[in-house]
Amino acid sequence: MIGVVVTGDAKFGMDIEAVERALGRVLVMPKGKSKAQVRKMECSYASVSDLPGVDLRFENGRFMYVSVDKPTVTTRSGFKVGDPERMVIDRLKTDSTYERYDDRYDETKMHITVGKIKVVGTGATQKIQGGYLIQFISKQDRVILIEAGEAAFVSLSEREGDCNY
């Protein structure tokens, strides 16, 4: 199941207020930004008031992605930051969408992804146009980051073209 428990009833694509209602928690906008400003920004992050290490990404005011870098929450399957990579592999390797690969920029990191994506184009024009992924990034055989959301945003985890809050 794709998602992390922190998202509760929040669904990707919801606006900021709907996410807050679904979570039953207050979102903290970037310093100096109001909810109204974030709704109009091409890209921005918000954090969850009482959950350190949880960041939500909004694109044009819509929830697209969640990132967790502390063991404050778990996935719906029970995984959390700090878990052994082997545990994730053993539980997910039979999923038909399972992939494990090296980080392009840091040879000490590994990525494990599951989920469905839609890719259009070929070669240099190929791009992700839909679907949802959950990704586990590990270093030294421990999960250090969990990301979930619309596939195009999860695939940005190596920070190509990432937004500036």
Where do the PLM segments sit?
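A cross-family detector of function-defining hotspots
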Residues: 14-59, 85-158, 164-165
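N-terminal low-complexity, Pro/Thr/Ser-rich intrinsically disordered segments
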Residues: 1-14, 165
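A short, polar/proline- and glycine-enriched secondary-structure boundary/capping micro-motif
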Residues: 74-79, 155-161
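Solvent-exposed, acidic/flexible segments
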Residues: 8-16, 77-85
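Acidic/histidine-rich, surface-exposed loop or edge segments in extracytoplasmic proteins
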Residues: 1-7, 62-73
